[in-house]
Amino acid sequence: MNKTDTLILEGGALRGVYTSGVLDALMELGIRIPNVVGVSAGSLNALSYLSRQPGRSRDINLNYVNDPRYMGPSHLLKTFSFFNFDFVFGELSHELVPFDYETFYKSEQSMWAVATDCRTGKAIFYHDKEMGEEFFTACRASCSMPLLCSMVKVGEDVCLDGGIASCIPLPEELPFPAGKLVVVLTRQKGFRKKGQGPAIDQMYRRRDRKS
């Protein structure tokens, strides 16, 4: 396991609780994989892995899942976003379940958050070492699911959830030599996504016109 070069974390909204358990186990064993790629919810889990805070991601999802400040239809109606990322990266990370920014910034591990460029439809890999505080905006973009969230501007890019363009990045997609990979999935073996149907297509078109 110590020879692993890259860890890829699939998204999956609240299914990411499984991922947080895997990362907690790695932290408890003292295993620090050099390169970490997070897609959607995987990027939020990756943050606590680099800040070396076992249990943090789990506690957030279990303790705040029913908190309307965190997510919910009322927030969707008010802001066009089901998830309240201002709360996640604000009060939650600074006061309620503090994020260890100092350890994160000093980490020798590298992290990439995957988002989808709304102009090109291609995946963008944002690197924590190159962005400073704006990297957290990239993580927000990585988690912004279409229809349920508004588009997020990262620099000059306009982005949505990374899972649209690259739900599980292939080695050749990565902006660095991947080496030996470990991929944490949040779907069962053999899962195949079904078509979304005409009703969902119509909802997307309506949302696009509003945007």
Predicted regions: what is each one?
Residues 1-39, 47-210:
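Patatin-like phospholipase
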